[in-house]
């Protein structure tokens, strides 16, 4: 576990770095924002034909990151299961055997940080979908319903890339 990556990430003030990065992505400095948006769209090969507005419309990277899509850009498939997001399905299965990666498992109670809430989902299923920076970052409900509650689970801010998922024990349970 004590790889150079792990040691570096462990020592890195992740909360401060995250806040600083968030601040920088929300800056509305026309010249800097234009350069940053163009680089981001080019580097990650964003398909701006799907976006509701052209690249020039977005005032900063943050707005670009959470952009809306044009109506009909994501038609709902006629299938039993529909993904709520763009991304890659990395794991799925019964909640009694939740897999992080490479045999690392965790419990639903440790993920939710609530034993009673976890009991309500006993015998259910889970899916872990990884959203890369280039993915569309809005979540759409794959079923009709009404949100009746939400909870915030504070934690660390480890990256959730493949390297972290494979190396950090209980990553999804300790992350915010």
Model regions: which residues?
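Non-catalytic terminal segments and appended small domains
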Residues: 1-176
């Amino acid at each position: 576990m004590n790889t150079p990556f792990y040691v570096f990430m462990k020592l890195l003030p992740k909360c401060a770095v995250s806040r600083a990065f968030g601040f920088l992505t929300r800056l509305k400095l026309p010249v800097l924002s234009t350069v940053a948006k163009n680089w981001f769209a080019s580097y990650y090969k964003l398909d701006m034909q799907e976006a509701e507005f052209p690249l020039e419309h977005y005032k900063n990277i943050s707005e670009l990151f959470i952009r809306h899509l044009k109506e009909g850009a994501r038609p709902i498939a006629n299938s039993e299961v529909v993904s709520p997001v763009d991304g890659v399905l990395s794991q799925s299965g019964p909640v009694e055997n939740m897999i992080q990666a490479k045999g690392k498992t965790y419990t639903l109670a440790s993920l939710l940080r609530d034993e009673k809430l976890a009991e309500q989902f006993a015998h259910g299923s889970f899916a872990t979908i990884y959203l890369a920076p280039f993915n569309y970052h809005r979540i759409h409900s794959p079923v009709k319903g009404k949100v009746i509650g939400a909870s915030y689970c504070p934690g660390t801010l480890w990256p959730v890339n493949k390297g972290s998922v494979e190396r950090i024990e209980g990553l999804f349970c300790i992350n915010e």
